[in-house]
């Protein structure tokens, strides 16, 4: 009883002391460590990706060799909502991911992925819009101008992240051996404040994914409005993947929460004048990268059947789609293409506070990198003013290409359409399909199973890697288009939909 009386006597004093303390709270958090156990050395700003000369560890015990492969890569994105202007001029309500790091890179059509030292430089820009009409209240003139650093201030994350989404989402590109930290911050549903939508990131096709980072809400974390979560990945085998939100996938994919992702092979980092067959053999010294065709039916990169003695740097080639060991996936220029579709009725119902009809979902607007023809051939780098008056990058990724005759083009094609199969055809430039779903088309004996065609067909959730070789192709404009006539329009009689141009000079 005495203790209770003492407690009551001191309670008012304790409460007064608590009132005097400063209050602080922050749910947005961004993570990008400069070093880890796998990558103990800091890569300074401006560093190139480390060369691949030997495994970082050998044998089952992973004995360190002193060689550090790959790097720490980071990227930051927002999840929210907004509107898109479709090719018929209508405003379409959408959900979307947007950039919160690498804004300068993304505005120029490049991946927003950066090494840790560049990512961790503070973001500092004088204006919120590219037209330089809306001053940024958090701008610090005393600090260097930096459009690519991560945005970590909560107020700035809202200033930049709201109404700043794109379809497809910010492009992600990493290398084999990289550790990748991806932070997603949920900035809320500004146009539908009645919605308390959670968002996640699902790395589609990631093998043996940890459920904690897989983005499926039943077994992992879902990010509430005002919260952040950092996903961690050790880069998988090279190939073309994609990513999307895994909250009610038919809805969130249909509404636009889809993005492109590809992993570059170690072979790109092999020193000049190295035999690619020998370099691929070197990977067999590390159990983490070894490909034992006699014991592992999932071996992704078997050695070629014959050593072609292709040397790194031959005819200037240092870029490949896969660890092929024979140079057969070499390319000069790459163009990531993501196919997507909109059902305008589904989006309209979602905008007007009504229950959405999943059984009746049927896409009628078809997109290449977020564009329908004729916008597919418009130059990248355009801007669109949102309802808040801020002009933001609009579809910064190009969906057309201009090349010199003789160059090899790598098309990284993925399909995130929810309701339709999609076909793309190329007339005049033959297609060589080299990979399906991030797996090189090669049997376990090392025989390449590539095939030539003039059209490819994908279902939602599939990817293809295609080489277009312009050797012997006459200069001119060539079309990449769908032969499905109802997909070659913008829900109208005139041409539109899935069509773009490749110009050979």
What are these regions (language model features)?
Residues 1-8:
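N-terminal secretory signal peptides that target proteins for export/translocation
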Residues 8-16:
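Sec-dependent signal peptide recognition
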Residues 20-24:
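N-terminal signal peptide c-region/cleavage motif recognized by signal peptidases
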Residues 25-505:
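Copper-binding active sites and cupredoxin-like electron-transfer domains
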């Amino acid at each position: 009883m005495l203790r209770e009386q003492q407690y009551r006597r001191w309670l008012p004093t304790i409460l007064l002391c608590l009132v005097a303390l400063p209050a602080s709270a922050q749910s947005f958090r961004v993570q990008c460590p400069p070093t880890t156990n796998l990558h103990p050395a800091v890569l300074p700003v401006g560093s190139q990706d480390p060369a691949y000369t030997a495994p970082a560890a050998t044998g089952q015990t992973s004995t360190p060799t002193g060689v550090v492969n790959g790097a720490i890569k980071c990227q930051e994105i927002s999840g929210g909502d907004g509107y898109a202007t479709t090719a018929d001029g209508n405003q379409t309500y959408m959900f979307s991911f947007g950039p919160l790091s690498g804004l300068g890179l993304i505005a120029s059509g490049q991946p927003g992925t950066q090494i840790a030292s560049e990512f961790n430089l503070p973001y500092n820009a004088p204006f919120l819009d590219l037209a330089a009409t809306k001053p940024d209240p958090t701008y610090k003139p005393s600090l260097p101008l930096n459009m690519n650093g991560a945005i970590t201030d909560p107020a700035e994350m809202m200033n930049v992240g709201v109404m700043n989404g794109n379809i497809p989402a910010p492009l992600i590109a990493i290398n084999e051996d990289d550790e990748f930290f991806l932070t997603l911050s949920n900035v809320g549903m500004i146009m539908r404040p009645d919605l308390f939508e959670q968002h996640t990131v699902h790395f589609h096709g990631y093998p043996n994914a940890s459920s904690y980072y897989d983005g499926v809400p039943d077994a992992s974390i879902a990010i509430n409005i005002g919260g952040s979560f950092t996903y961690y990945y050790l880069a998988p085998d090279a190939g073309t993947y994609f990513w999307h939100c895994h909250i009610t996938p038919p809805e969130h994919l249909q509404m636009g929460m889809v993005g492109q992702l590809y992993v570059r092979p170690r072979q790109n980092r092999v020193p000049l004048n190295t035999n690619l067959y020998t370099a691929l053999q070197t990977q067999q010294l590390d159990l983490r990268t070894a490909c034992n065709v006699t014991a592992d039916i999932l071996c992704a990169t078997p050695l070629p059947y014959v050593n072609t003695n292709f040397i790194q740097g031959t005819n200037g080639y240092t870029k490949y789609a896969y660890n092929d060991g024979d140079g057969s996936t070499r390319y000069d220029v790459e163009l990531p293409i993501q196919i997507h579709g909109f059902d305008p009725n589904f989006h309209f119902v979602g905008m007007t506070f009504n229950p959405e009809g999943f059984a009746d979902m049927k896409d009628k607007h078809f997109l290449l990198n977020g564009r329908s023809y004729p916008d597919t051939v418009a130059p990248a780098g355009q801007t669109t003013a949102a309802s808040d008056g801020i002009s933001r990058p609009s579809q910064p990724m190009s969906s057309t290409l201009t090349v010199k005759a003789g160059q090899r083009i790598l098309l990284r094609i993925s399909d995130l359409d929810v309701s339709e199969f999609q076909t793309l055809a190329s007339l005049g430039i033959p297609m060589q399909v080299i990979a399906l779903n991030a797996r090189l088309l090669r049997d376990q004996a090392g025989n390449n199973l590539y095939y030539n065609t003039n059209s490819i067909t994908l279902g939602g959730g599939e990817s293809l890697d295609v080489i277009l070789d312009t050797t012997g192709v006459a200069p001119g404009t060539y079309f990449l288009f769908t032969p499905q006539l109802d997909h070659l329009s913008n829900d109208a009689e005139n041409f539109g939909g899935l069509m773009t141009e490749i110009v050979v000079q």
